Amino acid sequence: MINYLILRFLWLRERGFVQITQKTLVSLFPFFLISGIIRVISLSVFSEMGYINQLFSVSDWLPTFKITGQVLINLSNFLGGLAGPLSTYFAGKYTAGHYGRSTGTAGVTSLLVSLIIGSQELLLSPLNDDGVLARINLPDSINIILAIFVGYLVGQIFRFSRASDDQIVDKDYIYQPKTVRPIFLSLILAIGLNILLVIGDQANVFQTIRKFTSTFTVTDNHLLSTFMMGLLNTFSAWIGNNQVFTPNSIAEDSFALENLTYAVSHHTTTGLPHLYTLTNLYHSYGMVAGIGSGLALLVALLLASTSYKDKKVSLLSVFPSLFNYGAPFMVGIPVLLNLVYLVPFLLAPMVNMGIAAVSLAIHLMPAAVYPVPDGTPSLLYAFIGTGGSLRALAISILCLGVDILIFIPFVRLSNKVQHGLKEEGESLETK
């Protein structure tokens, strides 16, 4: 069975789109790493409700606290907004290169296509009063895989054009007008997709889709609904939805707000109206090691991986991952769309939630009902949310240990897949 899986994974890794996707994700790693470090510092240190600021009162003794925080959060949002355009750029570049076309021209064209698609007001809104066009958006919520697919389409346009069509200048530095063809077709694609998005937004198509998908998580059983929402959120991260990496507020969970009101008014967490909330189970324990228990995978890779690259990425990603921002790690390995890690990625958070649900049912620990500061390390979320319960902290550590044990067999499977890829590469070189 294991050998069959390895052969299937090897076959999948040889597909062109998979190779392009993995190259793109790995290329995004340094940008995500820098953005992640800046984001963690801005939220945890330079935010009024930040975890480090609450501990050391940074805002009281640092004169430049507010301006530094504003600069850092703006820079982080800017880099985060570039995730979509950069994904499309690298995907277009690597697709064109995969088929022997000009990588530079395809990459820049893909970048322009991404900016046009993501700026719905660009083609429909007038210029500002001063004549400045300021309608280009860098959305903070994108699906990385969709952005990669758009770049892949642009790369295919360059692929099916003639080789001479993507040369801007020849060897004598003379401009070649034929390069207009693939660029023009790519821009037509961008405008068409932009118009479709505008029409879909005006017709409430996307709102209808969101309502439809939400019905899968609504059941009469509150505990089951919480598990379903946690599973859907985790799977959404695995397919590249970067919105799930945004810090969650207790204000977004109406049941958690009811619990908080009850705890404050009754001075106890006993007899809460909603014991199994998304905040109490998923955010506190399902994400005790980050989205998909990424921190546990990071530790498992450091312990069991034979890949120097994976260990290096893991070490570089430790800081943001500790503070519940695992996006750099997920693109650097990559974990996104990696079938080897799909099962543990989905399973580990569900196991954590199961452990927490049982512990709450037998009153082994109190419920996490209190607000948690921004940028709090994921391992301490339940500890702070329960008002400092050592039993909740012990359960959190237990969940992390269980997650590491879940991931280790899959890390060893990944070692075998990478070894197989290396052997195939060496055999091709000797032919």
Model-predicted regions and their roles:
Residues 160, 194-210, 219-303:
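Membrane-embedded translocation segments of transport machinery
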Residues 124-132, 226, 267, 333-337, ...:
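A cytosolic-side transmembrane-helix exit/cap motif
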Residues 250-263, 351-377:
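Juxtamembrane non-transmembrane "cap" segments at the membrane-aqueous interface
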Residues 85-91, 230-232, 296-297, 323-331:
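Hydrophobic, membrane-inserted alpha-helices
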Residues 1-50, 63-64, 68-238, 242, ...:
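Signature of multi-pass transmembrane helix bundles
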Residues 2-7, 56-60, 167-179, 254-270, ...:
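Juxtamembrane inter-helical linkers in multi-pass membrane proteins
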Residues 58-69, 268-276:
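Juxtamembrane membrane-water interface segments that cap and precede transmembrane helices
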Residues 95-98, 279-284, 298-366, 384-393:
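Hydrophobic alpha-helical bundle architecture
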